[in-house]
Curated annotation (Swiss-Prot):
Coiled coil: none annotated. Belongs to the TRAFAC class translation factor GTPase superfamily. Classic translation factor GTPase family. LepA subfamily. It is a peripheral membrane protein. The gene is lepA. It is found in: Cell inner membrane. NCBIfam families: lepA, small_GTP. It comes from the Bacteria. This is Elongation factor 4. GO terms for molecular function: GTP binding; GTPase activity; guanosine tetraphosphate binding; ribosome binding; translation elongation factor activity. HAMAP family: LepA. GO terms for cellular component: plasma membrane. It catalyses: GTP + H2O = GDP + phosphate + H(+).
Length: 596
């Protein structure tokens, strides 16, 4: 056991976590040169295309150190985006240490701070590593200074390396073996293992990635899942080297997979404890705190025949991504679907794309909204995540919106633009600290403003240098109203929005203008209106296509022309009473792109 080291690699987006992982695999001979490719752990197509890590990946390698001992390294490559912090905190629970990778050119960014604090809270040993030393703009002294000032851990002897060229990587491994403590646990005690991740395989059933705390588990054992109380027979155990490799057993301190042909999707939930059926009284390990979704959106299959496939796909995806939550909902405009909860906009985009690719579905997404608290006149407090479910305004005494605390790290020259943006988004400044060449500002902002497009706008006003981390703080009263969209006098429930009263007129105008571009012209006029309660605040009209009925009249009396025009008018009027308007998918997403 003293030769096992479990650690995670944590960093901000694009600071080189996955590339460093590649070098480790290459140096320890996990894959042959033929199988090696860039970011070998990012196995999902989506991850390769976007160049980001979405799922945490686990790898077991054997490293022969300079002192002649061979160490078993179990490491987990984690995502860097704020939307996937749950993946990171789960990975950290399986480790004793973490490598904090910082880009020697960019310096410390918000996500490196946030992930590092998560690691320290969980009692891990954090070891700083300066990456990208081969870049001309690398400035190790400044960055070491930043690590000490901003994060507060000693970085005087941080290892400098370049994951791309391979320089200094062996030094990182040497230091790691000495810095990160060995796991504690007893091999002879009853089995106690924590499920860190699970996914569904069509042939094998549920595959679970576990960290064994005590005891051992081998093929043929009967394991008990503590939360369901069901017993399963283990088919195989093993590790990823990154290839799927079976081993004889998994012992205390190791991280590996267990396959027990569990066919029920909820048979082995993430964060659960496994033990042997002969020792059912083993304590449950502290799992992970259940994470609350921040953004809700409706997902509907384009054709209603796909509803059952959609439900199946969501179940399988939830097993793999336990931060996704969903419940059935129906809409007048879109039929049956699910209301899903996500951790942020990127998470929502990724989930929708995974559903469309991996499960071959066609989906329509409604505009995302956050959770609001309402206090009714009866005295009860209710939570609303869907604008179309809002009760009548007259019965509400207080409307509360979620406020997040956003921490932004930005170079001094872009500070002004960032502050202007935060004020535009109704932010209130908490504090400001000058740390070296960077400034850290903290703002309280409405979550509604942050989740939609704040991140993109922040990047563009600061030329890509600002970085953001945010977390939910509290609910606060606000002057909010529900903005309805009426098309030919009918409310379209899927287009309703909750907005601040000050922005309502502007948003209403922008939305009706946008809808006018997107709804195709019909044979009759289509009125698009935005309303708050009974008051119409904006209107545009999609003009009718009309035939020139006077084309055949040459000369002749004017009454003849009048007759033809009146006849056309009557026909259009009749059409308008019975005609209905098809709303294209783009129109539902118009709500997202209001500011652009």
């Amino acid at each position: 056991m003293s030769h096992i080291r479990n650690f995670s690699i944590i960093a901000h987006i694009d600071h080189g976590k996955s590339t460093l992982a590649d070098r480790f695999i290459q140096m320890c001979g996990g894959l042959s040169a033929r199988e090696m490719e860039a970011q070998v752990l990012d196995s999902m197509d989506l991850e390769r295309e976007r160049g980001i890590t979405i799922k945490a990946h686990s790898v077991t390698l054997h490293y022969k150190a300079q002192d002649g001992k061979t160490y078993q390294l179990n490491f987990i490559d984690t995502p860097g985006h704020v939307d996937f912090t749950y993946e990171v905190s789960r990975s950290l629970a399986a480790c004793e240490g973490a490598l904090l990778v910082v880009d020697a050119g960019q310096g410390v960014e918000a996500q490196s701070v946030a992930n590092c604090y998560t690691a320290i809270e969980q009692g891990l040993e954090v070891m700083p590593v300066l990456n990208k030393m081969d870049l001309p703009q690398a400035d190790p002294d400044r960055v070491k200074d930043e690590i000490e000032k901003i994060i507060g851990i000693d970085a005087t002897d941080a290892v400098a390396c370049s994951a791309k060229s391979g320089m200094g990587v062996d030094e990182v491994l040497e230091r790691l073996v000495h810095t990160i403590p060995a796991p504690e646990g007893e091999i002879d005690a009853p089995l106690q293992a924590l499920i860190i991740d699970s996914w569904f395989d069509n042939y094998l059933g549920v595959v679970s990635l576990v960290r064994v705390r005590h005891g051992r588990v081998k093929k043929g054992d009967k394991i008990l899942v503590k939360s369901t109380g069901k017993v399963h027979l283990v088919d195989s155990v093993g590790v990823f080297t990154p290839k799927h490799t079976q081993t004889a057993d998994l012992k205390a301190g190791e991280v590996g997979f267990i396959i027990a042909s569990i066919k029920d999707i909820h048979g082995a939930p993430v964060g659960d404890t496994l033990t042997l059926s002969s020792t059912p009284e083993v304590e449950v390990l502290a799992g992970f705190k259940k994470i609350q979704p921040q953004v809700y959106a409706g997902l509907f299959p384009v054709s209603s025949d796909d509803f059952e496939d959609f439900r199946d796909a969501l179940q399988k995806l939830t097993l793999n991504d336990s931060s996704l939550q969903y419940m059935p909902e129906s809409s007048d405009a879109l039929g049956f679907g699910f209301r899903c909860g996500f951790l942020g906009m990127l998470h929502m985009e990724i989930i929708q794309e995974r559903l469309e690719r991996e499960y071959d579905l066609d989906l329509i997404t409604t505009a995302p909204s956050v959770i609001y608290e309402l206090e009714l006149k009866t005295g009860e407090t209710i939570v609303v995540d869907n604008p179309s479910k809002l009760p009548d305004v007259s019965s509400v005494t207080d409307f509360r919106e979620p406020i997040v605390t956003a921490t932004i790290l930005v170079p001094q020259e872009h500070l002004g633009n960032v502050i202007t943006l935060c004020i535009e988004k109704r932010g209130v400044q908490r504090d400001m600290q000058f740390l070296g060449s960077q400034v850290q500002v903290r703002y309280d902002m409405p979550m509604n403003e942050v989740v939609l497009d704040f991140f993109d706008r922040l990047k563009s006003t600061s030329r890509g240098y600002a970085s953001l981390d945010y977390h939910f703080d509290r609910y606060q009263s606000a002057n909010l109203v529900k903005l309805d969209v009426l098309i030919n006098g009918d409310k379209v429930d899927a287009l309703a929005l909750i907005v601040h009263r000050d922005n309502a007129a502007y948003k209403g105008r922008a939305l009706t203008e946008k809808m006018k571009e997107l709804i195709p012209r019909q044979m009759f006029d289509v009125a698009i209106q935005a309303a708050i309660g009974g008051q119409i605040i904006a209107r545009t009209t999609v003009k009718a296509l009309r035939k020139n009925v006077l084309a055949k009249c040459y000369g002749g009396d004017v009454s003849r022309k009048k007759k033809l025009l009146e006849k056309q008018k009557a026909g259009k009027k009749r059409m308008k009473q019975v005609g209905n308007v098809e709303i294209p998918q783009e129109a539902f997403l118009a709500v997202l792109r209001l500011d652009s």
